Amino acid sequence: VEKIDKALVAEEVKKEYHEIAGRFSLVSPAGYLHPKPMLMPFLMSGVGVLGYMGPFFTEYNLNPDLLPVQYPFTYAHEMAHVLGISSEAEANLYGFLVCSRSGVPEIRFSAYFALLPYVLSNAYGLLSEEEFNEWKETISPEVKDLYNRKVAYWENLYSPFIGEIQSTVYNWFLKGNNIPSGRKNYSEVVALLMALGNTSGEI
């Protein structure tokens, strides 16, 4: 994904949230909702923050350093927070459901690509080293290359010292907001997807 139509992403994400709102008891997004760019992207990129919801107003901010492949899913994830979802795992779930339902290939790909690190992490914890390495070989070389380039891109922007402080503080913040697993909550989206697939057969 070399470029992304941000206006089309906004249209598709809102449309799909309207589609799933009733099924998951979500608030439908208002037409006026739109993301704002971060004021200090260099600082946010330095700590690995892709987006966040502002604490004082119902608005969400996206990092202008986002790669095109990351933009649709991050847009949908942050919109989930605006719609009242506090859990990071649930925001990931709704971000995935919304983007993966899109008729736009780039938006669909963004959904699956965004969950790849969480799938890798879960697989690494569940499989033996041999099984994990065998499973990794099923991932296409193109996806592996894109993933490695994404990791290198953000590592180049990351500030280890500030990043470690932010990670610790954010972990405390999540736990203080009734998310006991803290930052690990993000990867719990895999369990949510498996549970949804088992109950509905949709995934």
Model-identified regions with their sequence ranges:
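Auxiliary, metal-adjacent structural segments of Zn-dependent hydrolase domains
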Residues: 1-60, 64, 68
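Soluble non-cytosolic domains of exported or imported proteins
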Residues: 4-7, 11, 65-70, 82-89, ...
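Active-site recognition of the HExxH zinc-binding catalytic motif
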Residues: 73-92, 96-97
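Short helix/loop segments within enzyme catalytic domains
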Residues: 96-128
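Polar alpha-helical coiled-coil and adjacent low-complexity
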Residues: 107-116, 135, 188-193, 201-202
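Amphipathic alpha-helical blocks and their helix-capping loop/short-beta junctions
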Residues: 122-150
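Pan-zinc metallopeptidase signature
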Residues: 142-203
